[in-house]
């Protein structure tokens, strides 16, 4: 690790059979920027049964794992509400030359890879399942793969991860201006 407020800078070429680059420490001031923004995105649900439908299924189901799954689905649907979509919000911080994204879902690694590609000169730290848990956010392509668990149990429609990436990019752009 480099000393505080130092950076490596190209110094000169040194001949040693082959040209070698020499690097030296130089003064570098640390960014003191500290800011936060709330990202908000409306995500559509998959075609999920409403609470009343789940309650009917629970009444018709004998004891066992099916009943347990229905009870869990009911708790999830109760939290989600009977609507067709939900606005999720999550904080994004700029701390110096780093960005922290605290997503309250479990996004595929495509989320952080996309943000890091979009902001190659910034350290982007993505935190999944922060401040609660809503669902998996698989890629569009993952929904078409047979028997892929995260896509099978996700509650949000295909494309919601990509929508979340777009909103995150726009929020980060506002922060770093």
Q: For each predicted feature, which ranges?
A:
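Non-catalytic substrate/cofactor recognition surfaces at enzyme active-site rims
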Residues: 1-177
